[in-house]
Each structure stands twice: as C-alpha cells, then as structure tokens.
C-alpha cells in the first residue's frame, strides 16, 4: 500500500511540473521569445509622449495630513548625552 501511495504522489508531482513547464504565457503585444513587434513599441512611445496619461497630485494629499515626526533627544535615562557614550574617543566633532 505504501508503494502505491508513493507512486501516486510522484505521478501527481510530475503532472504538476509538466503542466507548469509546458504552458506558455504571452503578454499582449509580445511575441514568442520575449520580443515585441516594432509597431507595438512605436505605439507605446507615442502614447507616452502624448502627455495624456500624466497624473496630478491632489492638493489635499494624505502626506499633508500626517503628524510631524518628533525628534527624540539624545540624552539617556541618566542624563548623559548619547553621542559621548557612542563615540568616546572622537574629538572636535559635535
């Protein structure tokens, strides 16, 4: 019984692998081998140059509604500056 189940699982795995490897998907405008027809590329460039697809940012954007970032002071719980603790051997830099 164990051998039959193993063979069944192997056949199912083989069927799945063959299904994925034998099928081929071509996107619209693409030819086999990943090449595009010259007419499609030219039409794409013309569409990009027309300027009709330019999106404008709305005046009330969500970024404006975000609260400002609060800066954390560089002092630890004991009141010592963290810069001095991180870089004890540095001189002349603040």
UniProtKB/Swiss-Prot annotation:
Primary gene name: gnrh3
Residues that bear Glycine amide: 33
Positions of post-translational Pyrrolidone carboxylic acid modification: 24
GO cellular component: extracellular space
Name assigned to this protein: Progonadoliberin-3
GO molecular-function terms, A-Z: gonadotropin hormone-releasing hormone activity; gonadotropin-releasing hormone receptor binding
Pfam families referenced in this protein's UniProt entry, alphabetically: GnRH
Function description: Stimulates the secretion of gonadotropins.
Entries under PANTHER family matching the protein: GONADOLIBERIN, PROGONADOLIBERIN-2
């Amino acid at each position: 019984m164990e051998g039959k189940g193993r063979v069944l699982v192997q056949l199912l795995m083989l069927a799945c692998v063959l299904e994925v490897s034998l099928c081929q998907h071509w996107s619209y405008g693409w030819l086999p081998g990943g090449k595009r027809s010259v007419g499609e590329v030219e039409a794409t460039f013309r569409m990009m140059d027309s300027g009709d697809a330019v999106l404008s940012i709305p005046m009330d954007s969500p970024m404006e509604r975000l609260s400002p970032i609060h800066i954390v002071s560089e002092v630890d719980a004991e009141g010592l500056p963290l810069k001095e603790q991180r870089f004890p051997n540095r001189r002349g830099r603040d």
